[in-house]
């Protein structure tokens, strides 16, 4: 299963594109609407949210996690990769 998360619904466009390439996969999408947007939040807050969402997605069976949020990628993906070395994280990186 591939887990995808964003601070809102913008990541749905990422989900649609991934699904075109990997239609046989199962997916779970998490939108953190209650805390959207992340842009004005502290780094600590964003990292904490990314950890909590990652844990939720892992509990649901995700093997790969797509961080479909520019802000979460910029702030938290390095931490996620360090803390969850067995999980592949794909971010919105140039």
Predicted regions and their residues:
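Non-catalytic structural scaffold of enzyme domains
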Residues: 1-94
């Amino acid at each position: 299963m591939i887990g995808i998360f964003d601070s809102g619904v913008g990541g749905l466009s990422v989900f649609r594109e991934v699904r075109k390439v990997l239609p046989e996969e199962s997916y779970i999408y998490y939108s953190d609407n209650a805390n959207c947007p992340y842009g004005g939040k502290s780094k600590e807050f964003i990292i904490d949210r990314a950890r909590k969402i990652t844990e939720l997605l892992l509990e649901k069976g995700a093997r790969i996690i797509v961080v479909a949020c520019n802000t979460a990628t910029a702030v938290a993906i390095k931490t996620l990769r360090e803390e969850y070395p067995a999980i592949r994280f794909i971010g919105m990186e140039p």
